[in-house]
Amino acid sequence: LMALIAETASFLIDGKLFPGCFALQYICNTVCTGFTVLVGYLWNLFLEFKIYRSMKRLKNKALILGFPLFAVACLMVVNLFGNGIFFDISDTNVYTRGGLTPILYVTVLIYFVESICAAHWAKYKGNSVKFFPVYYFVIPCLIGIVAQVMFYGISTGWASIAIGFVFVSLQLQTFNSFVDDISGLFNRKYFNFYMEKLCKTKRADIYGILLDVNNFKKINDDYGHYVGDGAIRNIGKILSESVPKNAVPMRMAEI
């Protein structure tokens, strides 16, 4: 929201002279330019945590991916001294791109490509990312950023990012409705959806294996539901890591 406001303000004051106009122009363009790279960085961290739910992995990923962001942040500070490496503000308060502007777009592209590779790698390793909205966010963002690069003077970058966030929100709602909260496996609602889809599109035979946990009620009675929930989570993790790529583990709960 801050970046959208800053970008709008930078377009409104561009070429207009008033007290403090140069400082305001520098601040607005620094915010909307620097935050573009920040979005790519935060998107990767969001993806990492959403897939693995591990703070240790998240901290390692944040450190590794933080180097390009830190380098850009340092250059943005240098740019504030008026050397125009990323952008320059003329004596008439007009914004122009600097010679190192492509570095910003390349950095964002690297972050987006990294998120796509991370999602595909997680899927290859057996994690449930069938509904994860990687492309729903990346594609609108890339379209908007590329359009803004090619057609100088239009503002589509942050508008496309906002659209990407809307797509992500809608897709995550669908994903959450199909996933069991405790086990992390797909639920019976997804089973019904999956079977209906297979009946319409797949001609090959479909097989299923139904497993039951022995004495699970006794675990809850003797040790409490907290321990029982932990057992369900462990079972879900074991099943997710054990099934082949063309199989889908689900939790049907009580039938």
Where are the regions that the model predicts?
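Membrane-interface helix termini and inter-helical loops of multi-pass transporters
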Residues: 16-19, 85-93
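Conserved long alpha-helical elements within nucleotide-processing catalytic cores of c-di-GMP signaling
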Residues: 187-207, 217-244, 250-254
